[in-house]
Structures are given as structure tokens and as C-alpha cells.
Design a protein with these regions (language model features):
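ABC transporter nucleotide-binding domains
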Residues: 1-174
Length: 174
């Protein structure tokens, strides 16, 4: 795989959360949620971040997307330093980066139909007409093996594997 470009390069990533105590909410320590994590993902490479519950997998992903700011370390996506981007530039960059959880039930709003869940990233990142959104939603749902009828269902009406396909569709639609 050495001939493939590095798409994501994470170097010495650390994410700490302050522990506050007392009446004045003074910081009395830190939870070390992510401690010195480094890895690279190359083009055409499949990557899975695995570990026991509470070990920092989700926090690592959210930190890479800068939904949580890193305490220290470096994050490069396609050669660009994500830590140097302002909020708007990072929001735009997130179109190219998505997290897909093993069972994404918690990340799918239970009050939204699959159609609405798939429209949401389109509304966030693009200015499309309703007809344009309908076309994109239909195309991506079929690409991940969901029928048009399933677009009107809610996340709890799907199996774990089907919910994962919905999450993958959300990641790909942007």
C-alpha cells in the first residue's frame, strides 16, 4: 500500500476534558479521554477504530472532525492541517469526512424519517431545490440498498445493519 497517498494523518492526538469542582467551578484536574493517538489512513484502505467501551473511540472521531477541539497533536486531511482551519473552513471540510458508528442508532434522530435524515446534510452543505434533494436522496438510498418505501420509515423500524446503511448513506450524500 506504500504507493497510495495518505488521506488522514493523525499525530500524537490528545483530548482532555477539565474536571471542575468547588463553588467557583475551578479546574481541579483533567480526564484524559484521548492520549497520544497516532495513525494514518491511505487511499483505498479500510480502517476501523476498535476498543472497549469508554476508551475514547468516539471522542477520537469527534476530535478529528473538530467537533471537539484537540488539546494537542496534529490532524492532516489530504495534506491540509485541520487544526489551522477556522470554524467555517472546517465546516466546509466536514463534507469530505464522516463518522460511521457500528450501530449508529444513537446518531440517528428517532423523530426523523430516513428521508429527512438524508436531506439534513444536503440542507447544511448545499443549496438544492426540493426536487434536487429528492433526486439525491433517492439515488443514495438505492446505492446503499434501501427502497424508496423505506425512506418514510423511522430509525427504530430498521435492523442494526440497515441503520448502519442509513448512516453510510448520510456520510456519502455530502
Amino acid at each position: 500500500m506504500s504507493g497510495h497517498n495518505v488521506i488522514l494523518d493523525v499525530q500524537n492526538l490528545q483530548t482532555y476534558f477539565p474536571i471542575q469542582g468547588g463553588v467557583v467551578r475551578k479546574t481541579v484536574g483533567y480526564v484524559h479521554a484521548v492520549e497520544d493517538v497516532s495513525f494514518q489512513i491511505r487511499e483505498q484502505e479500510t480502517f476501523g477504530l476498535v476498543g472497549e467501551s469508554g476508551c475514547g473511540k468516539s471522542t477520537t472521531g469527534r476530535t478529528i472532525l473538530r467537533l471537539i477541539e484537540p488539546t494537542s497533536g496534529h490532524i492532516y486531511f489530504d495534506g491540509q492541517d485541520l487544526c489551522a482551519l477556522d470554524k467555517e473552513s472546517m465546516r466546509q471540510k466536514r463534507r469530505d469526512m464522516q463518522l460511521v458508528f457500528q450501530d449508529p442508532y444513537a446518531s440517528l434522530n428517532p423523530r426523523m424519517t430516513v428521508r429527512k435524515l438524508l436531506e439534513e446534510p444536503l440542507k447544511t452543505h448545499f443549496s438544492l431545490s426540493q426536487a434536487g434533494m429528492d433526486e439525491q436522496v433517492l439515488w443514495i438510498s438505492q446505492a446503499v440498498g434501501l427502497s424508496p418505501e423505506q425512506l418514510e420509515r423511522y430509525p427504530h423500524q430498521f435492523s442494526g445493519g440497515q441503520r448502519q446503511r442509513i448512516s453510510i448513506a448520510r456520510a456519502l450524500i455530502t
